[in-house]
């Protein structure tokens, strides 16, 4: 692609000399064209000494003069600090998504929630360098960003840094050019293109330095007057031949002209799709503001008014739609100006129309009011009078509105003097407020003037305001520039025409225009703009009919498209929110399944975009049919977390979801499909999507029927997939064959960290395969293997794996028919394993003999924190052995001994251990008949123990005397937070003892006294005691023979005495 950069001395010398300007330009063009010395017929014109150095010549006086010229052109600008630090690096992207190619910028920001895929970044100073040792520098680079993201700011910043020698040091020549400049020419040759950037190149005293490598910057492709057509453009290699500007640019990008020059193009995403992907070597994207950068941006706008800043930040954070749009820097500044004017306009809460904006149109109405008030004009100018404000608003809309409107229709965003004259714009009005707040003026290199709206959305707002006013008196179709059409009378007729045009525009270019047009009919906007732009109360005649018209646009199509969702945005702007609210209430109540009409589907898709709850997790469980899901597919792409449990989905639905997960636009990170009817065919469809998906990190398929074949398909995908970190196949009957397939995947996969294989009929052979994989795998952190049948053989195999595995942190072997032999093997491994933190052996067949092995391991192991031995056969002998280990162990924090036939003797041993142990924070002894003696032993420990925070003594045969000593312990204990005494028999006496403790205890947060025969008297004691305890957060007094009336009285008393405490009666 690229020729040698080191040329001969004669060739390298072609950048110096004192030849004529024409000869200098010719030499420069030859070098840019890659012809070297042979391409120039007048080398003597740029001759230099043979021993002159090669390379960029950054210290050459002529280069310095060029850098100075660039600095005068780009001027000052933001330094890389505060919110502008984001320009120090760009996101590397792999081509454009369908959303970027087809939808409006606002839709892109809303759908992606202000952020794209997690992507690699490239530093600005490495933007044009190879990404690896084996790659080459990119010739054609494109940087994309929605309108107002800072593309031109980035270019100017890069040019400024290059002129100071801080970036692009291997470029001897940087030629920045904007499409606004190019639009002033009908035809150009390559020679004239360069001269337009370098007017000083023709001066006899200045020659061009050696272009060891040159960079041509083309800023703002979306502003190009004529779309680029790479299919029908004739190739041109003659730099002197004048051709249409779009043909010239096309040939430069193709490499027919300037093949040795690096090309950097900036563009909005949709416009960049004109360039074939095969011609683009590198694509980057400017990221938007994050929350901190939004704050810094607003701080820089209002550095001296902290009250205003605090209020403004609270408004932005409270409105999700406003926050998302503020990730776009230009919109963030516009929002700051509008909210700042609102703040300064408020005189008190009686100003109903001065409350913060709830819609886009309200926000822009405040900006419009700011412009009319003269707040945005230069200091020193007098503010306009009230009558001037009203006249100025209508005159500005009349002056610029038609231009803005027809510019939208033609996708024209830059205007020149001839455009202004064609639409009757008085140029004299553009210099002051309010036009200066909407339109910016820029001189081009061709000595002409270009105008553009300060942000695309302002053009759309002014266009909507123009259309709103014109449609009230127009008799022909306003969308026809010539004005010749079938008669159209009445505002509603013209609104219907606008809605139809917007629905038919596949690229969404009229979406925001229609939102603004709808918003101008809302009561709040009418109150804001009455007198200056709108007539007081005129919206009332049309608002209801417009709402019906918009809802009529929601047809029962196969899929809910972006246009349909925009209708819901329009209804929101109109402040007609009944449809969206009904669907939101149905989602919250679980009644979504009965709302299946096209309007409800569109509203659901809209909520998936804008709802705060859906932003956290879109819960569509128990609510969707295949048809409804199919219609929502385009919108599900952008849900971060998606729950589709218990929807009776079968394999065909998985084909649909697979297509979503395979999409380049897919943003889904977590998806749950639990308790559906998915078989191996559906699992295979999902597996195919995992081969290409790069966003999904968690997949939950529990409670389906994928079987061994489905597990194999998913396992094969895991050998390639590098993003999935959590996979649940619980209850899928994958058996040993499925476990073997998963084990094979784990041998090579290095990203999966959680694998759930509970209830899958896996036996010893499957466990052996998984153990073999664990000997090699270092990434898996959690393995859930409960409710299988691995037996002692499987346990021994896993034990061998634990001796060498240094990654697994949690292992669940509940209900696996493991006896003492298997436990002994596992405990032998624990003596040396240094990574396992949690082990569950509940519901197995561990006897006192196995408990001895456990005790030995606890004495040797220094990493295990959680051990669950619930529902085994430890008895007192086994519990005593473990108690001895607890005395010595310094790392175990949670110990579950529920339902192990433990009695008072073992409880006494555990109590003695707790007096010495300083690490155990949770002890579960429920459903063990430890009685009052056991409770006394535990109570003695609580008086001195400072580590235990949770104690579970449900159904432990504890009576009043046991409660008495526990109460005495609670009176002095300062660490216990949870005490569960459910299902005992402490009675009124026990309640009184605990009540006395509650009066002085300051640590307990949850107390469960359910089913303890407290009676009314005992409950009253507890309720009364809480008047002095304001730290208890939850108490359960159910099942204590209090009666309904007593329960209400006790509940009210507790709420009175402890308002923050939740009561269960």
Curated annotation (Swiss-Prot):
Residues 1-10 have a biased composition (Basic and acidic residues). The keyword Repeat applies. Its main location: cytoplasm. One of its GO terms (cellular component) is perinuclear region of cytoplasm. Keywords: ATP-binding, Cytoplasm, Leucine-rich repeat, Nucleotide-binding, Repeat. Signal peptide: none annotated. ATP binds at residues 145-152. Residues 1-62 are annotated as: Disordered. The leucine-rich repeat domain may reduce the interaction with TMEM173/STING. This is NLR family CARD domain-containing protein 3. The gene is NLRC3.
